[in-house]
Amino acid sequence: MAAALAPRRHHLLSAADTTLVKVFEDRAVGLQRAELVGAHTGSAHMGLGLAELAAGRIDNHVHSHEEGFYILDGEPVLYLDGRGVRLKPGACGVIPVGVPHAWRSPGSARWIDMRAPRPRDPDQPTDTFVLGPTPEAEPSELDIRDPRNRNLFLLTDSDMDIDRLKTGASVAAPTVSASMATAALAYSGITVKMLVDQRTDAQLSTMFMVDYQPGAVAHPHDHPFEEAYYMLAGEINVVADNERYTLRPGDTFWTATSCIHAFYETTGNHVRWLETSAPGPPNRHSYRFQRDWEYLQEQRGEDAQRQPTGARGRDTSSSDRATG
């Protein structure tokens, strides 16, 4: 019997191969979507898409999955639990499980949507339930300072500017009050800003923005969850399971649980991408860096060389008995 092929643990979809098609015509007008990550890429946990709504609407409905989003272009209106909010590029948020929502766009708008758990297959019971037509109420402007706002956020370029974040924020600044909950994380030439997580009431996934400075690197590692990356600016080299790719704006890359991957900025330019993960990361052991365990292996090898031959033999037999 021939050995079964191992499941592929990563997938690249180039911008050139990303195709928008009409979807959900029973409940939407003017909507097109490209399925970037899903069952067809090997994902068990997420459905990532690029949506475009041109002079159209999506009727009021609920999902039995969570849906995060990030606005790329345009000013669509999101009706979330009956309240309309006009969004703009950089706006993002989460639509919790079971919360009624609808969309309307007077012009053209594009956004990334992230669904977790992965939407059900066509031959399974539905995970989407239409409630009625799209509301027509006049929307309000997005105000992220309003403490009643639970699910929405707005990312600006200054939120990723580490030098600006070194100075104090004005009490009248039109942003969420600065704190550890809204902080940007900087390491190894990389800046990470959380957009959608438990702070915005996401329970099943996360979404965040990633900036790489010239020469930045993330050494080989893997995770106990899946990740997807949608390129926005610059070029980055990614190595996944020993295969190397160059990612450019509009490209989508996905890594499965246990896919060992690394990122290298090699052109001397700034890089930015939108990243998602599902399930949400655990409190500990989100990363498993290869270099840490290689270090342990090296140390163990040095210890073994320093031991008498007899002692090394006894350690080996004891280990063999313990592991069976």
Where would I find each of the regions flagged by the language model?
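Glycine- and acidic-residue-biased ligand/ion/polar-headgroup-sensing regions
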Residues: 56, 64-77, 81, 225-237, ...
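A short, N-terminal "cap"/entry segment at the start of jelly-roll beta-barrel domains
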Residues: 1-44, 126-204, 288-324
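A structural feature that tracks compact, well-ordered secondary-structure segments
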Residues: 207-210, 236-238, 251, 258, ...
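Conserved short histidine dyad/triad with adjacent acidic residue
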Residues: 32-34, 48-63, 189-193, 208-222
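Short acidic-glycine-tyrosine-enriched beta hairpin
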Residues: 82-98, 242-258
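A short hydrophobic beta-strand segment most commonly corresponding to one strand
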Residues: 94, 107-126, 254, 268-287
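A generic "binding-loop/recognition-motif" signal
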Residues: 64, 83, 99, 107-108, ...
